[in-house]
Amino acid sequence: KKAAGAASTKYMKIAKKMGAELVVYDNVTNDVYMQDLVNGRTDVIVNDYYLQKMAVAAIKDKYPVKINDGIYSNPYSTSFTFSLKNKTLQEKVNKAIKDMKKDGTLTKISEKSFAGQDVTKKTKVDYPEIDISDVE
């Protein structure tokens, strides 16, 4: 099968590991991915679940596609990188995140930003880990 995605992403590495033929895109919109999927140029788009969920919701009337809610792999988290010289900023950011989590602001931002999904809470999905350390 042909998997669509951006070069060198972990998603394309997973597709390659699973035996897909890679169709690599460079800086294109979701519209291009979806059009190629519908036209048969590709068979699947391998990408971040939440980003794809939003993309499909945005174009559902334009393209007959659907996200497979039953396939998950390789969970990830986001980090902030601070200069070691700026401990004060790190402390302020950590406090702000803690406060926003406590008062529900992070959940509201998440639901607004991720098509109604609360990404601040761990999912109940048992993610399989696919080792891609050997994939170029």
Regions found by a protein language model. Name each.
Residues 1-2, 42-43, 96:
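Short active-site oxyanion
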Residues 1-34, 49-53:
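Bilobed "Venus flytrap"/periplasmic-binding protein-like clamshell domains
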Residues 10-18, 23, 95-136:
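Ligand-binding clefts/hinges and TM-proximal coupling segments of bilobed small-molecule sensing domains
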Residues 13, 43-74:
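A ligand-binding cleft/hinge motif common to bilobed small-molecule-binding domains
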Residues 14-15, 32-41, 77-79:
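Short, charged, surface-exposed secondary-structure boundary motifs
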Residues 37, 43-45, 80, 93, ...:
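Residue-level signal for nonpolar/aromatic packing positions in well-ordered secondary structure
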Residues 59-95, 116-136:
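Periplasmic-binding protein-like
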